[in-house]
Amino acid sequence: MANFLFEFEKPLVELENKISDLKKFAEEKNIDVSRELELLSAKAQQLAKEIYQNLTPWQRVLLARHPERPNTRDYINYLCDDFIELKGDRRFGDDPAMIGGIGIIENIPVTIVGNLKGKDTKENIMRNFGMAHPEGYRKAIRLFKQAEKFGRPVLTFIDTPGAFCGIGAEERGQFQAIAEAIATLISLKTPVLAVITGEGGSGGALALAAGDKLLMLENAVFSVIAPESFAAILWKDSSRAQEASELLKLTSEHLLEFGLIDGIIPEPLGGAHRNPAETLKAVKEEVVKNLQILKETPVEELLRRRYQRYRYIGSGIVEGGVS
């Protein structure tokens, strides 16, 4: 059960705690409360459906940022029978906000690259909250090209508020590194599968997303800017982030409707943080299925489709929906 709660989750968690306390009391006193537990459990299940099947875009943003969602390291550990991490961009240094290496998934050698957030405050500071520097993106580019050289498919995991925008990052060519990462992926002569697992923030996310297929977890988000920043720029009021999230159309359902992603990976009721094991299993099933499909497709066909995809991406979107 999650230790970190959002306001809209509290009624459910309070009820679940009540059920847990009642079970403990019944065991200690050796009394039968099975009927009461059955009624409370049914009530909790119904309340969970009411909460999580009617989430607003802002609530999905909050879930995408939940500190107890599985991170890229969790996915690597679950998916891979073996994984060798590779570090450094061979130009400046390594970036802990970006993890990359070679893994074996169901006997398929795969190059894996992803944003990496921390599990606690100390690790988040070390990993810069998943916001990569130029050396992180250049490390990714190095691994993309290595994958192409050895004929390995590329799998990326995206979970970042965006690329780091500090002075040092800009001085070291952040914009150029992101642009080169996008260009490299689009022209890469090997299959590329991308999965947005949490936050997909701006160019920092797009640098890992320009592949043959782009999947999103149900409660992940993908947008050109964070709702708070959108509100601060447009209305000079970051407190209107909830309103901004409605306008950004950043949920997986919106993006699938617009044709900007290829599929949605369902999350357990309540979100990935409430049942990480089920989430990891669902992601592995989709990753293995899509990797096998992409591996069976000739590289020339992948490149042709990829060019068409990004040459005309968004061209069917008009005001009010999809044309």
UniProtKB/Swiss-Prot annotation:
EC nos: 2.1.3.15
One GO MF term: carboxyl- or carbamoyltransferase activity
UniProt similarity note: Belongs to the AccA family.
Localisation per UniProt entry: Cytoplasm
GO cellular component terms, semicolon-separated: acetyl-CoA carboxylase complex
Any one GO BP annotation for this protein: fatty acid biosynthetic process
NCBIfam families the record matches: accA, AccA_sub, PRK05724.1
PROSITE patterns membership: COA_CT_CTER
Keywords: ATP-binding, Cytoplasm, Fatty acid biosynthesis, Fatty acid metabolism, Lipid biosynthesis, Lipid metabolism, Nucleotide-binding, Transferase
Top-rank lineage group of the source organism: Bacteria
Pfam families: ACCA
The reaction(s) this protein catalyses: N(6)-carboxybiotinyl-L-lysyl-[protein] + acetyl-CoA = N(6)-biotinyl-L-lysyl-[protein] + malonyl-CoA
HAMAP family referenced in this protein's UniProt entry, alphabetically: AcetylCoA_CT_alpha (MF_00823)
Gene: accA
Top-rank EC class of the record's enzyme: transferase
Lyase recorded as keyword: no
Protein name: Acetyl-coenzyme A carboxylase carboxyl transferase subunit alpha
Quaternary organization: Acetyl-CoA carboxylase is a heterohexamer composed of biotin carboxyl carrier protein (AccB), biotin carboxylase (AccC) and two subunits each of ACCase subunit alpha (AccA) and ACCase subunit beta (AccD).
InterPro entries in the cross-refs: Acetyl_CoA_COase_a_su, ClpP/crotonase-like_dom_sf, COA_CT_C
UniProt keyword annotation of Nucleotide-binding present: yes
Protein role: Component of the acetyl coenzyme A carboxylase (ACC) complex. First, biotin carboxylase catalyzes the carboxylation of biotin on its carrier protein (BCCP) and then the CO(2) group is transferred by the carboxyltransferase to acetyl-CoA to form malonyl-CoA.
Annotated source species: Carboxydothermus hydrogenoformans (strain ATCC BAA-161 / DSM 6008 / Z-2901)
Pathway(s) annotated for this protein in UniProt: Lipid metabolism; malonyl-CoA biosynthesis; malonyl-CoA from acetyl-CoA: step 1/1
Residue ranges annotated for the CoA carboxyltransferase C-terminal domain, each copy included: 36-293
